[in-house]
């Protein structure tokens, strides 16, 4: 006869034959599981693999875009350290992408015994290309109208080939004011999407894929220590995010990380540690990259983690849903707000620029998502496996 106590299931007659002490021990474990609140239960590997939507990730995306907007709008009086910390929002984006894309690819392979590269690239293209090229065309029109003869405008035209081919992160230096420079992060992600699925197919196993990422991480870390700009330009959070996905997909890797990342308070503790790593000067990029991946892991392994309530709150979830549009449009929104404040005689030196940019970016991104992006997103369903 099978008896279940909470998460413990066993054959009661068989266990009774093992002796009263063994049966009593198992019975006490079952009762403890019954008495233990659900939000304290540890997630098993099977539970993790059964999760279809990591709902906390939208909240993390919201933090990412709000941090980026803060970086571009923070008033001078907050200081360079606090203002520049917002740039790490891109690193969080990277870690989320590395983790989520790798997880989706691994689960597709587990279900269908193969990864459909064509379907993957079509889905990614429908998500990224329409808005990216739409905003790029808008920038071309605005530069032609407003800055065609300026040095900055001419530089924009010269860089168009790199913006169009998603190589701006490699060939467009940040030297003064560079129009559309923020697209470097989208370029880095597109390069990851282009290379990583093929690598996963070629290496053939989780262990070899993980070893390959560890080698890349070590080489890039060595390059950073040596001061090599090429290696410093590699987005390490994408690598650590992908490595996290590989480890969690494996039962051994999951069991290794679960005691550290799967506790209810892991997300809060690691989030505080990440905040310190970002704010304290001199922390190496690879350390921050590991923290970003650990935070993503802590917010996905344990479904009812301590930070979940505010990460899945409706405003955070919604901002996370439209975060790509906010990222692509926030610099235009910032410029509109700065010029509007100037036109009414209001100096743009306080927090109002950040607040107004967030509000306008949210409205514009919502309109873009509803009336433009969603049309292309519906086409993705034909390529979903």
Model feature map: region roles:
Residues 168-224, 229-235, 368:
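Hydrophobic alpha-helical segments with transmembrane-like composition
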Residues 58, 62-65, 97, 130-133, ...:
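Residues within membrane-spanning alpha-helices of integral membrane proteins
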Residues 38-56, 63-87, 102-118, 141-145, ...:
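Alpha-helical transmembrane segments in multi-pass integral membrane proteins
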Residues 40-42, 129-188, 221-222, 290-301:
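Membrane-interface helix-loop-helix regions
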Residues 11, 15, 21, 38-39:
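Intrinsic-disorder-associated, low-complexity terminal segments enriched in Asp/Asn/His/Tyr and depleted
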Residues 58, 120, 182-187, 327:
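Short alpha-helical catalytic segment bearing the HExxH-like zincin motif
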Residues 51-57, 85, 112-133, 150-157, ...:
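Membrane-interfacial loop-to-helix junctions in multi-pass inner-membrane proteins
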Residues 2-9:
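Extreme N-terminal basic, low-complexity initiation segments
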């Amino acid at each position: 006869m099978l008896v279940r106590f909470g998460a413990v299931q066993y054959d009661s007659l068989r266990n009774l034959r093992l002796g009263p002490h063994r049966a009593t021990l198992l019975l006490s474990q079952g009762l403890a599981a019954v008495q233990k609140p659900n939000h304290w239960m540890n997630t098993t590997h099977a539970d993790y693999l059964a999760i279809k939507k990591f709902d906390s990730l939208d909240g993390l995306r919201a933090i990412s875009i709000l941090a980026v907007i803060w970086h571009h709008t923070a008033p001078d009086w907050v200081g360079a350290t606090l203002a520049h910390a917002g740039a790490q929002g891109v690193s969080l984006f990277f870690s989320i992408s590395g983790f989520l894309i790798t997880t989706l690819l691994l689960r597709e392979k587990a279900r269908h015994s193969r990864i459909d590269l064509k379907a993957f690239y079509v889905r990614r293209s429908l998500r990224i290309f329409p808005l990216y090229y739409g905003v790029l065309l808008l920038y071309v029109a605005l530069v032609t109208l407003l800055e065609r003869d300026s040095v900055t405008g001419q530089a924009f035209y010269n860089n168009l080939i790199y913006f169009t081919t998603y190589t701006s992160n490699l060939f467009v230096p940040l030297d003064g004011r560079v129009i559309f420079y923020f697209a470097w992060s989208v370029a880095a992600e597109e390069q990851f999407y282009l290379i990583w699925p093929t690598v996963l197919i070629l290496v053939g196993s989780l262990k070899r894929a993980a070893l390959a990422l560890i080698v890349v991480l070590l080489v890039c870390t060595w390059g950073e220590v040596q001061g090599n700009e090429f290696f410093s330009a590699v987005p390490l959070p994408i690598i650590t995010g992908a490595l996290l996905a590989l480890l969690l997909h494996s039962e051994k890797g999951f069991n290794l990380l679960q005691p550290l990342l799967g506790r209810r308070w892991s997300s809060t503790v690691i989030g505080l540690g990440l905040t310190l790593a970002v704010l304290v000067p001199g922390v190496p990029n690879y350390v921050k990259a590991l923290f970003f991946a650990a935070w993503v892991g802590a917010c996905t392994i344990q479904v009812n983690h301590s930070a979940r309530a505010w990460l899945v709150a409706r405003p955070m979830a919604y901002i996370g849903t439209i975060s790509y549009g906010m990222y692509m449009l926030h610099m235009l929104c910032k410029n509109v707000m700065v010029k509007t404040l100037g036109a009414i005689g209001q100096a743009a030196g306080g927090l109002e620029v950040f607040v107004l940019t967030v509000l306008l970016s949210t409205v514009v991104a919502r309109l873009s998502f509803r009336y433009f992006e969603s049309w292309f997103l519906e086409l993705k369903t034909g390529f979903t496996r």
